[in-house]
Design a protein with these regions (language model features):
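Nucleotide-state-sensitive switch-loop elements of NTP-binding domains
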Residues: 1-13, 17-196
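Generic beta-strand structural signal
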Residues: 322-324, 345-346, 376-377
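Beta-rich strand-turn-strand
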Residues: 339, 368-391
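Structured core elements
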Residues: 6-8, 34-35, 64-67, 129-130, ...
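C-terminal lobe/tail of nucleotide-utilizing enzymes
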Residues: 195-338, 349-351, 356-358, 362, ...
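Short loop/turn motifs at secondary-structure junctions
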Residues: 1-3, 125, 237, 371, ...
Length: 404
């Protein structure tokens, strides 16, 4: 079985260099490795000092590089969706001839990069796929899309498909608006099932894992902690944290030693947050990581004899348990504060909102008729209590900021 390792972190922390070092190590061990960039501003070519494009290119024995172009993937794999969207907006009086597809659904095009990675994995061509993702904010938005879109497809697509078929003639004749045709709707349905498979793949702890990259400074550490919390919210496995650009103990001047003491404070904070997760410290090099020799040096220095590629720290992000008078659902939310969390229920779905991120979890059939009785956030876990619903009670229950 192949593996997928996703590297992400705040922009400028060195995630591409560290992903490249892992790819070089894996290739040297005889694993056929693909290092793929899912960033809209890729720089694999800059680091390896070679031309990289939309097709995999060799970069040494067992090592291949690929920079994905989402617009090209949409045109090649879902031409009818793209055409339908242009017809829909064009018939509404908007001139789209000079606009890229990404302007139609902002941010949505990045999803096709993940779908392409799934296709590459399913081909079995590579032993290991290392993904250099966009900065954490974009990556989190991207990783939550498969689950979010799958939920909407399951809830609303059957009705929407029927309405489009019925309304298409009227819409075109009376309002001059061209709705998606049957081919486009079939592609949307095909994409839905691809999203379901993608979600299962990315959340399979035996296949996929996420590695976070950061530097020991306040803004980066705060974002890394939030990313770790949100990744747990969406049930992704985080198997490592790489702390980059660490100053030596004696940096040679009072100014640098002062910054070194600040870094140590944030390193201790990260070690507390990522307890149980492997943490790798990386020195601040006097030169930029560029070219195969520099990547190899980083690989030898950082990875050494460690078997980092096979690290698997499986955690149960969602645990259902029977308890007195009902059931409980426990979800890992490391670093979450109760005031940042809202939980409410609609029918057989539980919605969890943490700051600006929202996740909808369909409840198992065992909890049919149950409703939220209360919830709490403590010690890095969200615990939701369910009890049997009284007859005639409203099926929509909300637990507000106080958890009641």
């Amino acid at each position: 079985m192949g593996r997928i390792i996703i590297f992400t972190g705040k922009g400028g922390v060195g995630k591409t260099s560290i992903a490249a070092a892992h790819a070089v190590r894996a290739a040297s061990e005889g694993k056929k490795t693909l290092l793929v960039s899912a960033d809209m501003a890729p720089n694999l070519g800059d680091i390896f000092e070679t031309e990289v494009g939309g097709n995999a290119v060799p970069a040494g024995d067992n090592l291949y590089l690929l920079e994905l172009d989402p617009d090209q993937l949409v045109r090649e794999n879902y031409p009818n969706i793209s055409k339908a969207m242009r017809n829909l907006f064009g018939s509404s009086g908007l001139a789209l001839d000079n606009l890229d597809d990404e302007m139609i659904i902002p941010g949505f095009e990045n999803l096709f990069s993940l779908l392409k990675i799934r296709d590459i994995y399913n081909s079995g061509e590579y032993d290991l796929i290392i993904v250099d993702c966009a900065p954490t904010g974009e990556t989190l938005s991207l990783l939550k899309l498969p689950e979010l879109l799958s939920w909407y497809m399951e809830k609303f697509y059957p009705v929407g498909k029927t309405m489009v078929r019925v309304m298409a003639p009227v819409s075109k004749a009376k309002y001059k608006v061209t709705l998606p045709n049957r081919k486009a709707m079939n592609e949307i349905e095909q994409m839905h099932w691809s999203l379901v498979a993608l979600q299962e793949l990315l959340k399979d702890p035996d296949v996929s894992s996420v590695r976070l990259v950061c530097t020991p400074e306040k803004m980066v550490v705060d974002e890394t902690k939030r990313s770790y919390m949100y990744l747990n919210l969406y049930h992704y496995q985080v198997h490592g944290d790489f702390i980059n650009r660490i100053l030596p103990d004696d940096a040679g001047s009072d100014f640098m030693n002062h910054w070194g003491s600040i870094q140590k404070k944030y390193i201790r904070e990260l070690e507390s947050v990522f307890a149980g997760i492997p943490i790798t410290r990386i020195a601040w090099y006097p030169h930029e990581v560029r070219g195969r020799a520099a990547i190899q040096h980083l690989c030898d220095d950082v990875l050494g004899d460690k078997d980092i590629l096979n690290v698997r720290v499986h955690t149960d992000n969602e645990i259902y348990e029977a308890c007195d008078g009902g059931w409980s659902l426990t979800i890992r939310l490391p670093g979450a504060a109760k005031e940042d969390v809202t939980v409410y229920q609609h029918e057989m779905d539980v919605n969890i909102k943490v700051n600006n991120f929202n996740r909808c979890i369909p409840l198992p059939n065992t909890l049919t008729g149950a409703q939220i009785d209360g919830w709490d956030v403590a010690d890095g876990f969200l615990r939701i209590q369910f009890s049997k619903k009284a007859d005639g009670q409203d099926e929509t229950a909300e637990a507000g900021k106080d958890g009641k």
